[in-house]
């Protein structure tokens, strides 16, 4: 039983990690804020599946405020672990971007009986992240896992806004054979996340494998 619970805890950590990274799916035109683009979509929703079962949704809201891009994320999911325990996951986060860098963010995550709040803000050439455990300080341009602008993923490290930790990444892109668009893989230290985009860089799908639980998949809801 101890070994089973150890696997369970590890799987839950990866599941929550993947969920918290899913930060937006927005279609842009060729002029405006952030990487020279404007927002076309104001609200985008993803259905979330674990295996073949729908376990919840993740909704994203986008707003241009002057030179800033404001992104709000809300997730609500319930999934079962080893057929005997339901886990409730609730998440809300707010990010503010400018000039391809994160200006500030705040996040609140409830998973089961635990709750975590984190916030961060740019101060000149420093980005300070704080939570109940203290502060972390980073230098230079900080970026989170901005799936909605794939060029922003091309960095050596990306910020996990759930816990305020910079994660080493390597991104590989490849064309989709026999269909339009392209795919991208975010290689993490112990796992990977596969993404699908349309030709206009519109993010439409996410997939990753969770040990013992199966495939986690985000699928964009077409309205």
Stretch-by-stretch model annotation:
Residues 16-27:
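Bacterial N-terminal signal peptides
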Residues 23, 55-58, 157-158:
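Short acidic/polar alpha-helix capping motifs at helix-coil junctions
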Residues 39-41, 106-213, 218-220:
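Solvent-exposed helix/loop surface patches that form functional interfaces
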Residues 29-36:
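Boundary at the C-terminal end of the N-terminal hydrophobic targeting segment
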Residues 40-44, 48-122:
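N-terminal mature ectodomain segment of secretory-pathway/periplasmic proteins
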Residues 3-17:
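Bacterial N-terminal signal peptides that target proteins for export
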Residues 223:
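Ligand-binding grooves and catalytic loops that recognize ribose/phosphate and carbohydrate rings
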């Amino acid at each position: 039983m101890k070994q089973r619970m150890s696997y369970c805890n590890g799987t839950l950590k990866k599941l929550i990690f993947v969920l918290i990274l899913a930060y937006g799916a927005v279609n842009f035109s060729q002029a405006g804020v952030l990487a020279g683009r404007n927002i076309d979509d104001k609200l985008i929703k993803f259905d979330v599946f674990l295996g073949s079962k729908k376990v919840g949704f993740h909704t994203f809201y986008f707003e241009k405020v002057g030179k800033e891009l404001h992104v709000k994320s809300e997730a609500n999911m319930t999934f079962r672990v080893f057929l005997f325990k339901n886990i409730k996951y609730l998440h809300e986060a707010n990010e503010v971007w400018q000039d391809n860098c994160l200006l500030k963010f705040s996040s609140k995550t409830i998973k089961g009986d635990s709750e975590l709040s984190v916030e961060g803000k740019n101060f000149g050439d420093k980005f300070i992240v704080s939570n109940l455990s203290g502060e972390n300080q980073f230098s230079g341009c900080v970026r989170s896992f901005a799936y909605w602008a794939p060029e922003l993923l091309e960095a050596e490290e990306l910020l996990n806004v759930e816990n305020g930790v910079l994660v080493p990444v390597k991104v590989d892109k490849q064309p989709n054979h026999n269909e339009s668009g392209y795919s991208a893989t975010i290689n993490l230290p112990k796992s990977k996340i596969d993404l699908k985009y349309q030709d206009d860089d519109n993010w439409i799908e996410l997939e990753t494998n969770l040990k013992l639980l199966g495939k986690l998949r985000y699928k964009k809801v077409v309205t």
